[in-house]
């Protein structure tokens, strides 16, 4: 083989190996950062993976909020009006967090079926509902409760 062709072949192979490594690293990073959404029904039915970061959302069940007296630990139940799941969280809840309103919690599902959240997101006004929560409520035959009008 001609030395010039051999050099070109080695350069092309090196580029292909580099591109392959870059694509592999990018796919690996994407896989680790994907947080799939699960409804309380899917979590209760065992469809959500254990010890993997997920998003769980629904309506905060009225009367379910429990705050620890001596720490920032919070426990509440989220429902899609079909099934419910308990969520625990350590931290300050968003100002807009209310019972009877939609939330999305990011965290890991433990073996007890409890989502241990490290982030809780509350809807930002009375009309907004995360798309996944809206779909889950629609699928369960329910609709989001409408807030009482002031006046």
Swiss-Prot record:
Transmembrane segments: 9-29
Topology Cytoplasmic: residue spans: 1-8
Coiled coil: none
Keyword Metal-binding in annotation: yes
UniProt topological domain (Periplasmic) ranges: 30-151
GO CC annotations on file: plasma membrane
UniProt-annotated stretches for the region Disordered: 131-151
Example of a GO biological process term: cytochrome complex assembly
Cell membrane in keyword set: yes
Cystine connections: none
GO-annotated molecular function: heme binding; metal ion binding
Matches recorded under SUPFAM superfamilies: Heme chaperone CcmE
Compartments it resides in: Cell inner membrane
Mode of membrane association: Single-pass type II membrane protein
Major localization class: membrane
Binding site residues for heme: 124, 128
Keywords (A to Z) from UniProt: Cell inner membrane, Cell membrane, Cytochrome c-type biogenesis, Heme, Iron, Membrane, Metal-binding, Signal-anchor, Transmembrane, Transmembrane helix
UniProt cross-references to InterPro entries, sorted A to Z: CcmE, CcmE-like_sf, NA-bd_OB-fold
Family: Belongs to the CcmE/CycJ family.
Role of this protein: Heme chaperone required for the biogenesis of c-type cytochromes. Transiently binds heme delivered by CcmC and transfers the heme to apo-cytochromes in a process facilitated by CcmF and CcmH.
UniProt protein name: Cytochrome c-type biogenesis protein CcmE
Protein species of origin: Pseudomonas fluorescens (strain ATCC BAA-477 / NRRL B-23932 / Pf-5)
